[in-house]
Every structure is written in structure tokens, then in C-alpha cells.
From Swiss-Prot:
InterPro entries: CHIT_BIND_RR_consensus, Cuticle_Struct_Prot, Insect_cuticle. Glycans are attached at residues 90, 107, 111. This is Endocuticle structural glycoprotein ABD-4. The keyword Cytoplasm does not apply.
Length: 116
């Protein structure tokens, strides 16, 4: 698709930054894109770790085919960026025989590490 020379207006845009490191922003464009995010500053749990941001947000837009897309996400030091959306592919179900085998294996005691 060729780039458009059409200027898309910003309908609304807000941003708040707080002294404690937390923030909130959102915007909406003339072509229906919306986005928002909130974040807080979290102290590292170890003395050698710095502070980091924990964020939650969402964005939505309409694709070229007219389909509405919405994504919610979180981001932190433990899980990284974790998006969720109804349009994301999902894995196929695990066949029952394989699931039974996995369940059985989970009940077994740990085995010693293999030695070279």
C-alpha cells in the first residue's frame, strides 16, 4: 500500500508525569486510532538492581479491510511485553493422549542430572 499524503489530525492527547515516576498518557487520532498507557516506577528487589517501569495499556485501530483490532498489554521486568488480543493466533489444543502423558510425567519424581 502506497503512503498517503493525507494529514491525520490528533483529536485528543493527554500526558501526566508525576514526581514519583508514575505516568499516564492517551491519544486519539482522526482515523480512529486510540492508545493509552499507565506506568508506575518499581524498585528492584536486589541491591544491584535499578528501578524499572511497570506499564499497562491498550491500543485500537481499524485495519485496511475494515476489521477493528484491539490490543491490551502489560510490560514489566518479570514477563517483558505481554500483548493480548482476540485476533492473535492461538495454539491448537493438545491431543488427549499427549495431555495424559504430560500429566503422568508431571507426577514422577525428578531424576538426577545426566552425567557426561
Amino acid at each position: 500500500q502506497a503512503p498517503s499524503d493525507k494529514v491525520i489530525p490528533i483529536i485528543s492527547q493527554n500526558e501526566v508525569r508525576n514526581p514519583d515516576g508514575s505516568y499516564q498518557w492517551n491519544y486519539e487520532t482522526g482515523n480512529g486510532i486510540k492508545a493509552d498507557e499507565t506506568g508506575t516506577l518499581k524498585k528492584g528487589s536486589k541491591p544491584d538492581e535499578g528501578d524499572f517501569i511497570v506499564a499497562q495499556g491498550s491500543f485500537s485501530y481499524t485495519g485496511p479491510d475494515g476489521t477493528a483490532y484491539q490490543v491490551q498489554y502489560s510490560a514489566d521486568d518479570e514477563n517483558g511485553f505481554v500483548p493480548q488480543g482476540a485476533h492473535f493466533p492461538t495454539p491448537p489444543p493438545i491431543p488427549p493422549a499427549i495431555q495424559r502423558a504430560l500429566d503422568y510425567l508431571a507426577t514422577l519424581p525428578p531424576t538426577p542430572e545426566a552425567r557426561p
